């Protein structure tokens, strides 16, 4: 088992399962990671990435005059930024799905907060970290080599949407 380098610090990342309804089916956006990526090259995933202090520190604060300023909605701002950077889309109705904690191969503890959100506009334009994209149904997840767990997350979203 990999031991964490720091006991109190975690790398926090967010992912967004973007969905849209086409006819009677729900479709989910997945992207194929570039072969030059160190982690999970050539595997399919959903948009997301790490939180950065700049996602919130220059934004509107609550209790700005205190010794310890606070920023609300930092995770949502990160998710919107990552989706815009990676696939050039706008999203709405962001909903929490689940979280996953693990220790990366480099020893850094990580937490991924996974959300699902409605496609709200734009045309997919990939950044340099992805080489392909597809809008797929939950039934098609087995046709793609996805990063472990993404298939399960898409199935969970499908269940939640079907229950509406």
Q: Which role fits each region the language model picked out?
A:
Residues 1-23, 33-37:
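Acidic, metal-coordinating catalytic segment for phosphate/diphosphate chemistry
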Residues 11, 90-93, 100-123:
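Active-site-adjacent beta-strand/loop module that shapes the phosphate/pyrophosphate-binding cleft
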Residues 20-24, 34-35, 118-123, 138-140:
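Short loop segments at secondary-structure junctions
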Residues 25-81:
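Conserved Nudix-box catalytic region and its N-terminal flanking loop in Nudix hydrolases
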Residues 82, 86-90:
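Short alpha-helical functional segments enriched in proximate histidine and acidic residues
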Residues 114-116, 125-157:
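NUDIX/MutT-family hydrolases
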């Amino acid at each position: 088992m990999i031991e964490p380098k720091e006991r109190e610090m975690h790398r926090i990342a967010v992912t967004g399962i973007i969905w849209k309804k086409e006819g009677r089916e729900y479709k989910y956006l997945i992207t194929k990671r570039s072969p030059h990526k160190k982690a999970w090259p050539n595997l399919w995933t959903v948009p997301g990435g790490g939180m950065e202090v700049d996602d919130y520190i220059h934004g509107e604060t609550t209790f700005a005059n205190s010794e310890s300023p606070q920023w609300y909605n930092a995770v949502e701002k990160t998710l919107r930024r990552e989706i815009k950077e990676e696939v050039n889309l706008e999203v709405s109705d962001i909903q929490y799905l689940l979280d996953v904690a693990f220790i990366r191969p480099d020893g850094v503890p990580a937490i991924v907060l996974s959300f699902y959100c409605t496609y709200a506009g734009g045309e997919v334009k990939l950044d340099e970290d992805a080489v392909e994209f597809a809008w797929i149904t939950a039934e098609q997840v087995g046709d793609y080599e996805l990063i472990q767990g993404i298939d399960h997350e898409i199935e969970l979203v499908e269940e939640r949407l079907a229950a509406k």
